Amino acid sequence: MEYSPLSIVITFFVFLLLHWLVKTYKQKSSHKLPPGPWRLPIIGNLHQLALAASLPDQALQKLVRKYGPLMHLQLGEISTLVVSSPKMAMEMMKTHDVHFVQRPQLLAPQFMVYGATDIAFAPYGDYWRQIRKICTLELLSAKRVQSFSHIRQDENKKLIQSIHSSAGSPIDLSGKLFSLLGTTVSRAAFGKENDDQDEFMSLVRKAITMTGGFEVDDMFPSLKPLHLLTRQKAKVEHVHQRADKILEDILRKHMEKRTRVKEGNGSEAEQEDLVDVLLRLKESGSLEVPMTMENIKAVIWNIFAAGTDTSASTLEWAMSEMMKNPKVKEKAQAELRQIFKGKEIIRETDLEELSYLKSVIKETLRLHPPSQLIPRECIISTNIDGYEIPIKTKVMINTWAIGRDPQYWSDADRFIPERFNDSSIDFKGNSFEYIPFGAGRRMCPGMTFGLASITLPLALLLYHFNWELPNKMKPEDLDMDEHFGMTVARKNKLFLIPTVYEAS
């Protein structure tokens, strides 16, 4: 018996409709969910995001104005809660933090980071607690970050020399910043520049664009035939295989080096890099949960991705905002040039006095948080603000909207670093109107590493050079379009013209 293509398609969509009706009935009959917009069969509220002509975080903010700071959406098969106010964020990340400590299990991390065994996406439990402890006490502690200061100093010196040689001509500042951070993190993680560094950084960027949480496969996880059409899994696996080959080679070389040192055949008593630390802990036998080589690769991948793309994007946005707001740029430069007064070498220890530069960084992270939609998942049925949030509900904490909430921020969409002058608000997740690094148990453990990677290059760029937009572009004409992913970067590269500052 033969079936026509039309009958197959009709059967498929009837199945989808029945599947949706069953899920919708169960939801409505058992839970009082927060308000949300009307939804269509099968796709739910996806059409509202698809037709918004803006990025997801911005489209969600527009819906929030109508439905409130705790809003329910049905994104395909996924029941989703959107949190868009400091008060509701505190409920999720402090009051009921342990109820929402899980990460949604997305397709890309499952393959990219070895079954989601990195610090960002590992399921909540003994393994995750151990990895977080290792990151906090060993890999990303203030002492460890400080031990890499000579690397940051060296790589930033090379950056300034490179820009100096191109002074007077437009340069791809975005590319230079990403290369700076890639080399810096590579030396900290692997002990030296990696031969495959350019390819590895390219793979990192591809992976980040695949981990935004709005892929079809993530929104319709049970519809396997649909996954064959999107080929998302194949794309992720291709990136993973190429990255794994590079990481495998790095681990092999580290293991060989450790063997030579143990046997007394090597003189490589170098400073421990991050791979060395993880291998030492693995071999120590002191870990409650044994660590595999794949676990090590997952953690290193995570640190590399966060340390390069997140920091480079923040520097991009800081320079973009100052080019858009030249008075801010001039004020930051005046502070630097007054304090250092013709000094040739500026070190990290010199930066404590730069109060306005610190405010510039804070304001950049308010308007451009590294992760604009922080993903969580409910693991214990919870009542919040009179609504019952069922287990497995995906939660998206919209840090982009929270940082622009007019109830907490005057002139919320304007870049005004002065708002942080004499302010007690910090990065530590205690002020829920300002959570660029998250808050609670899942707060980013790499905050200290990230801030150290941002502050020195920004200071040097402003101190050593004056900056102009190319083609006599006016500040108001500089585009600020975003490219959405796990990290939200500029959509278009930032090209600027540097001229060397000569102290009078």
UniProtKB/Swiss-Prot annotation:
Binding locations of heme: C444
InterPro entries per the UniProt record, alphabetical: CYP450_71D (IPR052306), Cyt_P450 (IPR001128), Cyt_P450_CS (IPR017972), Cyt_P450_E_grp-I (IPR002401), Cyt_P450_sf (IPR036396)
Enzyme class: oxidoreductase
Induction: By fungal elicitor.
MF GO annotations: heme binding; iron ion binding; monooxygenase activity; oxidoreductase activity, acting on paired donors, with incorporation or reduction of molecular oxygen
EC number: 1.14.-.-
Keywords: Heme, Iron, Metal-binding, Monooxygenase, Oxidoreductase
Statement: the UniProt record of this protein carries the keyword Oxidoreductase: yes
Gene3D superfamilies: Cytochrome P450 (1.10.630.10)
UniProt keyword annotation of Kinase present: no
Cofactor needs: heme
Family: Belongs to the cytochrome P450 family.
Protein name as annotated: Cytochrome P450 71D8
Organism: Glycine max (Soybean)
Gene name of the record: CYP71D8
